[in-house]
Every structure is written in C-alpha cells, then in structure tokens.
Amino acid sequence: MSFRREKFIEFGGPDGGNGGNGGSVIFVASSAVNTLLYFRYNQHIRAENGKAGSGKGKFGAAGRNRVVEVPVGTQLYDEDGNTLIADLNNIGQQYTVAAGGRGGIGNAQYKSSTNRAPTYFTYGTLGEEHCVLLKLKIVSDVGIIGMPNAGKSSLLSRCTASKTKVSDYPFTTLEPHLGVAYANGCELVLADIPGLIENASSGAGLGHKFLKHIERCVILLHLVDCSLPDIVSAYELVRQELKLHSQELAGKQEVVILNKCDLLSEGEVREKQKLLESSTKKEVITLSMGDELDSLIVFLHAQVKKAVVTEPSDTSFDPFLYVHYNKK
C-alpha cells in the first residue's frame, strides 16, 4: 500500500503497484543428462520469489522459473509412488512440478469513483509445494534378455566398450548396463538386462525391478545358452514371464540368438538350432565367442529402423530417488 507524496500535491492518491508472480519449478527432458544423480544432492528445489510492488505504480518483477533438466524417460509419481503424474519421454518435453504463486494487488488497483483513497490491498498467494518420486526407465534400441548366465554381459562387452562384470555364475548383472555399438556407420544402443527366471513377473530374482526397463527398448535380443539340456524350455520360460508382465512387452519384435555355440560340436549346434527354430517359428542366429559382430550390429540396426520407434534412446539407469520440490 502506498500513496503519492510530493511537494505541492495535496491529494496524491494511491499509487501502490502490484507484486510480481513467483517463479515455477519446471522439469524438462534433455539429452544432456542421463542420470538422476543431481537430485541426490539437491532434494529441495525452489524457484525465485516475485518482487514486491512499490510506490509510483511500480509493479514488482516476476520471479524467475527454476528449469531443471532431467533424463529422457523420467517418470514423476506422487509421494506414495502409486499415481503417475508425468512421463517425460521426448527431448524438450516439460512439466511444471510446482507453479509459482500470484503476486499481490496494490491499493492503486482499488481506486474508484466512490473510493478515491483506498487503504486496503490484497496479499499474493503462496506457490505450490509438492513431494514427488522420480523413476527412470532405461531407453535403448536393443534390450538383451535371457536367463541368467546366457552370456548377455559378455555380448555387450564385445559389441561395445561397456565394462560390465562378467563371471560364470547367475545374476552377475545386478543392474542394467548400457553400451553403444558402432559398425559400418551404424550406431546402436544396447541394454544388458539382468537375467530373468521363473516368476520374475511376480518379483522373483531380479524380475520386478527390471522388467519395466525392457518396455522402453525398441526390439529385444533374446539369448539362449546353447549348452543347456533343454533350450526350448529356457526360451519359453523367458517368453512366459514377458507375457505375464504385459502383452505390450511380449509383442515387441524379437531376434533370437543361440549363444555359446563354441561349447558344442557343429552337428549338435545345427540340431539345436533346428529344434529352436521349429519351436519359435523364427530364424535363429548362432553365435560363438570368436565370431565377428559387425554384421550382427548392422543387422540389428536394420531391425530397429523397421520397428516403430516411439521413444528416444538416450538415457541410463539410476535408482529411484525421492525429491522434495517446494517454492514459497
């Protein structure tokens, strides 16, 4: 509230200006970041307050928005983690997490023919304050799936420069790993998904935690260990878990590879290849440790281009993190 006070002006009248609106907290999906690590150390995010109005009818400046870049594939849930608020799938997509408050109204705005000197004004409103849960799903061109010890991490390491842990025991991979493969001008992002076991769709093994990451892959690369006594059952077990998780996941395009063929004779490999092709009704590729992979990368790149790409492939795995956003 303010009144004009100048020499020789007896009845200056009200001249209090309005306050500025507060800034908002806005999330923008960006390819410049690929983890949620920033929020581990910045759990409270505030935008700038609006400035107060002043005399001579001066309006206060609006507060600057706080724009925070997040990886493509970031999902925002309510505090309980049950309700999806926003899904930032595309570069440049944005969501206002907490809107800024409205500025107050100065007494000059209440001047009228019946009230030439109003002595009242309106306070501004508080900005929004929210506590949300961030989740990040892997987004890749090719998701490498299969049972534990099928050779997924070894294949990723050979195709890319990804330094994933490789050992001869189940569940060596405890979190998804990404790698970028290059061959003959083709670029491909591959994700090594931890092995799936029976009842993975119900949370057994590492299932529940990582089945959701496969949803963001364009196509699936299904590895089957050639040395297993029953390769058909091994293949069908993984397929069944995909179906139980979601029909959308089970309907993704799939390339089947019979891996570790160097452990068997050529005759045994051909026999198992025919058996698996007969069961899956798909062409099965055989792969040994010493095989060159450029042709495989080019082939997978062509399959990705044919598939309907609905999501970008430019992010990485990160644990779920609680982040508290507020602006007052």
Swiss-Prot record:
It comes from the Bacteria. Pfam families: GTP1_OBG, MMR_HSR1. Its EC number is 3.6.5.-. Its cofactor is Mg(2+). Residues 1-139 form the Obg domain. It is found in: Cytoplasm. This is GTPase Obg 2. It comes from Anaplasma marginale (strain St. Maries).
